[in-house]
Amino acid sequence: MKKLSLSLMLNVSLALMLALSLIYPQSVAVNFVAAWAILATVICVVAGGVGVYATEYVLERYGRELPPESLAVKIVTSLFLQPVPWRRRAAALVVVVATFISLVAAGWIFTALIYLVVSLFFRLIRKACRQRLEGREPCQG
């Protein structure tokens, strides 16, 4: 319950700051949104790297049979194999777009572009690792 309330408070404060930064592009709320974007960028880069390494480790060591007691398996399942409801995906897309628009409107263009590229890259990494773990090879162009 405590984790849920903390997550709810963070999401509400982010939504409020996003709304304020879209209404007032030169306000302090933009700094909060920029700090959020930089933090999210770092998290996506680290999670993507750790996830890819753990996926390769799990596939090399265990193959397709995933023992639940391994730390690498827990990392892989929490990052890549948990189903994401469509409402959460839609909300995440709205947050990414609103963050991008807010940062561009305030003049943080480089930060906005890096945030957008890294978040899309993390989604691609997640999809490719999920396909590898399910036994399908990603599309090869």
Swiss-Prot record:
Interacts with holin; this interaction this interaction blocks the holin homomultimerization and delays the host cell lysis. It is found in: Host cell inner membrane. Involved in lysis inhibition. Interacts with and inhibits the holin thereby delaying the host cell lysis timing. It is a multi-pass membrane protein. InterPro entries: LysA-like (IPR047759). One of its GO terms (cellular component) is host cell plasma membrane. Coiled coil: none annotated. It comes from the Viruses. The chain crosses the membrane at residues 4-24, 32-52, 94-114. The keyword Transcription does not apply. GO terms for biological process: killing of cells of another organism. Keywords: Cytolysis, Host cell inner membrane, Host cell lysis by virus, Host cell membrane, Host membrane, Membrane, Transmembrane, Transmembrane helix, Viral release from host cell. This is Putative antiholin. It comes from Escherichia phage P2 (Bacteriophage P2).
